[in-house]
UniProtKB/Swiss-Prot annotation:
Signal peptide: none annotated. Its EC number is 1.1.1.85. It comes from Vibrio parahaemolyticus serotype O3:K6 (strain RIMD 2210633). Keywords: Amino-acid biosynthesis, Branched-chain amino acid biosynthesis, Cytoplasm, Leucine biosynthesis, Magnesium, Manganese, Metal-binding, NAD, Oxidoreductase. Its cofactor is Mg(2+); Mn(2+). This is 3-isopropylmalate dehydrogenase.
């Protein structure tokens, strides 16, 4: 029993966001009951509903609430209703990106695994998916070619050109590498750093700095892999990977590939962290407005996002493992929502939340 209290800013957002967030609340209620942890939770508008109620996708009151909290549990934003707005005023770009910038969330964590009983959903061959895999992609989120200067277009005709610049500072690589190694210590103690050090100067520095940081983690095994080989190895033998450490653009590619080979995007959580371990936790999927309000959405990604919050921002590893174990038990027992049930009877969104909370309390 930890007898600790944490303040959580809860931002359900749009589409299926409120429905799946309600299930995360059930699970956190169960954690409170079992572990003696107290979560002070307040819900605030973000995204399309914030546009409707406040005239902008990210009200100042929501930002203030996040600043006063230990972590942010985020649902999903966006939908056809707001697509007519200018791009910067739409829910996705007007809410998530400013939040990441305001809180300097430089690290993105994307776990991807095949749960027992769901191997058939993977597009991989049965002999590969049957071996299972459990990977966390640690992606640098604020540097690299997406943000480097100069970038632009100039000239005309045959001489017209476009250019982007890949830039990484030593401190940016150091801080993301430390999170990768610390994450590995909580798992199977292996880090594979992805780069293109046979071609790119930025990757040469990346590899040098990662090697230096590795000296502080002698208990963690470090390997390096070129990005082109890594994309092939993920298809051939994903079980070889534990923590994959990536730059911004390589992490963008690798995390989506990892998501695809699980075969179940509705199951994948995501975390974005800053240097003080403050984090924003959200499902990797979208707001799915086509199924909103039907009580059929899969809440597992939202629930597992809450587990990541407990692990990385709150330091409650035992509670995080309880949630993940409860999810695995439910899935192994064939308790599935409509996206996974095929020809079997499907659980509703709320029934799935009830089941996972029940497994936590009975474990």
């Amino acid at each position: 029993m930890t007898d600790k209290s944490y303040k959580i800013a809860v931002l359900p957002g749009d589409g299926i966001g409120p429905e799946v967030m309600a299930q995360a609340h059930k699970v956190l209620d169960a954690i409170e009951q079992k572990h003696g942890i107290s979560f002070e939770r307040e819900e605030h508008d973000v995204g399309g509903i914030a546009i409707d109620n406040h005239g902008c996708p990210l009200p100042e009151s929501t930002v203030t609430a996040c600043e006063e909290s230990d972590a942010v549990l985020f649902g999903s934003v966006g939908g056809p209703k707001w697509e007519h707005l200018p791009p910067n005023d739409q829910p996705e770009r007007g809410a998530l990106l400013p939040l990441r910038k305001h809180f300097q969330l430089f690290c993105n964590l994307r776990p991807a695994q095949i749960h027992a009983g769901l191997e058939a959903f993977s597009p991989l061959r049965a002999d590969i998916s049957g071996r299972g895999f459990d990977i966390v992609v640690v992606r640098e989120l604020t540097g690299g070619i997406y943000f480097g200067q100069p970038k632009g277009r100039e000239g005309e005709g045959a001489n017209e050109k476009a250019f982007d610049t890949e830039v990484y500072h030593r401190y940016e690589i150091e801080r993301i590498a430390k999170i990768a190694f610390e994450s590995a210590r909580l798992r199977r103690k292996k880090v594979c750093s992805i780069d293109k050090a046979n071609v790119l100067q930025s990757s040469i520095l990346w590899r040098e700095v990662v090697e230096e940081i590795a000296k502080d983690y002698p208990d963690v095994e470090l390997s390096h892999m070129y990005i082109d080989n890594a994309t092939m190895q993920l298809i051939k033998d994903p079980a070889q990977f534990d923590v994959m450490l990536c730059s911004n653009i390589f992490g963008d590619i690798i995390s989506d590939e990892c998501a695809m080979i699980t075969g179940s995007m509705g199951m994948l959580p995501s975390a974005s962290l800053n240097e003080s371990k403050f984090g924003l936790y959200e499902p990797a999927g979208g707001s799915a407005p086509d199924i909103a309000g039907k009580n059929i959405a899969n809440p597992v990604a939202q629930i597992l996002s809450a587990a990541l919050m407990l692990r990385y921002s709150l330091g409650e590893e035992a509670a995080a493992q309880d949630i993940e174990s409860a999810v695995s038990k439910a899935l192994s027992a064939g308790e599935l929502t409509a996206d996974l049930a095929s020809d079997k009877p499907a659980l509703t969104t709320s029934e799935m939340g009830d089941k996972i909370a029940e497994y936590i309390l009975n474990s």
